[in-house]
Amino acid sequence: MDIKSALSRIVGQLDLTTEEMREVMRQIMTGQCSEAQIGAFLMGMRMKSESIDEIVGAVSVMRELAEKVELQSLDGVVDIVGTGGDGANIFNVSTASSFVLAAAGCPVAKHGNRAVSGKSGSADLLEAAGIYLNLTPTQVARCIDSLGIGFMFAQSHHSAMKHAAGPRRELGLRTLFNMLGPLTNPAGVKHQVVGVFAQTLCRPLAEVLQRLGSKHVLVVHSKDGLDEFSLAAPTFVAELKNDEITEYWVEPEDLGMKSQSLHGLAVESPQASLELIRDALGRRKTENGQKAAEMIVLNAGAALYAADHAMSLKAGVELAHDVLHTGLAWEKLQELGAFTAVFKVENEA
């Protein structure tokens, strides 16, 4: 199916099959479509609402074309990632949580990018922390094997995305591509926490990941609108485990934590996010640093559970709490900076 035929179908509010979507996505990602066609396709899909079959087709093509990171084993390797677009401008919770996971001995293959609508994307934060981002897939694998954590800079692994960059930027709206990033981890992880910008996406994206072979995934959205677990409100979870999907709400109190406002956790820049994370991961914390630490513990705990590194969400949160307060997570961030600095010298020689 070509993109013109697909547009005719979409205008008629008809869904594409998985295979038809694969054909259209391959044309988009290999530069066979004009920017006008891509923009029309993305808007048409949004107006119609993307089906599970369509998302599966799009994800499978992006995964196929990605520059992959080959790991010795994917057992218990986890990614904690959000779609962004929640408008809250909270500090980089998922990225900070990743260092707690690594300090707990749980390997992390973190996939992320620069901010699109927010103040600080994961790549922006890590760059502010002095971590070199432009790694080869082999270098990322060496980071994960040696340190238990590596960062995959999305634009380095999904170069085919460049064909859709112009239309996405000019539309300035959330499109299908906002959902695809968290579903296209270049290391092919089977364990994830995926935060989404709307509760209505939780179940569908859990079903997409089920069809694509994921093992244990939590797809989450909090009642106060975050694409992660919140301290200030219940969080809705669609959990894929043992090839079954269950849906439920989680309150901070269910996990042994106290509900509190998120006041003081919004940031205006990657540097401000880094300062708050340094405060949160350090041994002596300000009031905002303590609150940020609890937000990190909540989300790192969920990822420890998704990685099967803890038997329950509550056990994951307890482990994350213990690890964060050792100060080892901040040391892990500094180790990654030193480790990638060597690769920077190699790559720029």
UniProtKB/Swiss-Prot annotation:
GO CC terms of this entry: cytosol
GO biological process assignments: L-tryptophan biosynthetic process
Binding site for anthranilate 1: 82, 113
Binding-site positions, anthranilate 2: 168
Pathway annotation: Amino-acid biosynthesis; L-tryptophan biosynthesis; L-tryptophan from chorismate: step 2/5
EC number: 2.4.2.18
Ligand binding (Mg(2+) 2): 227-228
InterPro entries noted in UniProt: Anthranilate_Pribosyl_Tfrase, Glycosyl_Trfase_fam3, Glycosyl_Trfase_fam3_N_dom, Glycosyl_Trfase_fam3_N_dom_sf, Nuc_phospho_transferase
Known partners and oligomeric status: Homodimer.
Name the record gives this protein: Anthranilate phosphoribosyltransferase
Name of the gene this protein is made from: trpD
